[in-house]
Amino acid sequence: MTPFRAGLLALVLTLILDQATKLGLYFGTDLVLTQPWRLAPFADFVVVWNRGVSYGLFQQEGGIGRWLLVALSLAAAIGLGLWMRRATSRLLGIALGLIVGGALGNAIDRAAYGAVFDFVHLHAGGWSWYVFNVADAAIVAGVIGLILDSLSPDGRKDRASPARGDPAPRL
C-alpha cells in the first residue's frame, strides 16, 4: 500500500469513527439528559459543545467566527491532503490522514451545529483533562506520527531534496 493510500484509509476511517461516535451518542442515547456516564474511575462520557478551537480557546458565539473556523479547517485539510499526496513514508501518510480526518470531522460539526461535539472526559483525583472526541484524539496521534517520522532516519532521508539527475518521487 502506498503512503498516500494508507493516509487516505486513515482519513476515511477517522472520519467515519468520529462521526459515528458523535451521532450515535447524541441521537442514539440519552446521554444529553443523563450525563455524566461513568466509564471508569478516571473516565466519563459527557456532552460539551466546543465553540472554540483546541482546549476551548477562542470561543466563537457569532456566525462569522464559526464560518472562519470552518474555512480555516478546510484550508488546513486541503494543504495537509496535498502533503499527504506527496508523502514518501507510510507513517507520514497515516499521520497526515489522521490529522485531515480529524480536522474534517470537527469541521462537519462546526458547520452543522455551530460547535464541535466533545464527549470524552478523563480525570483522576483533582486532575482533569479537557473534554475531547475521536477527531481530537486522531489529530494528536497524527501530530505524534509527524514527530516520529521527522525523527526517523527514513523520514529525514525522505525529505531530502533529490540529487541532480535523481528521479522525482513517484506519486
UniProtKB/Swiss-Prot annotation:
It is a multi-pass membrane protein. It catalyses: Release of signal peptides from bacterial membrane prolipoproteins. Hydrolyzes -Xaa-Yaa-Zaa-|-(S,diacylglyceryl)Cys-, in which Xaa is hydrophobic (preferably Leu), and Yaa (Ala or Ser) and Zaa (Gly or Ala) have small, neutral side chains. The keyword Protease applies. Keywords: Aspartyl protease, Cell inner membrane, Cell membrane, Hydrolase, Membrane, Protease, Transmembrane, Transmembrane helix. The keyword DNA damage does not apply. It is found in: Cell inner membrane. One of its GO terms (biological process) is proteolysis. Its EC number is 3.4.23.36. It holds the Pfam family Peptidase_A8. GO terms for molecular function: aspartic-type endopeptidase activity. InterPro entries: Peptidase_A8. The active site is at D118, D136. It comes from the Bacteria. The chain crosses the membrane at residues 7-27, 64-84, 88-108, 128-148. Pathway: Protein modification; lipoprotein biosynthesis (signal peptide cleavage). GO terms for cellular component: plasma membrane. This protein specifically catalyzes the removal of signal peptides from prolipoproteins. Belongs to the peptidase A8 family. HAMAP family: LspA. This is Lipoprotein signal peptidase. It comes from Methylobacterium radiotolerans (strain ATCC 27329 / DSM 1819 / JCM 2831 / NBRC 15690 / NCIMB 10815 / 0-1). The gene is lspA.
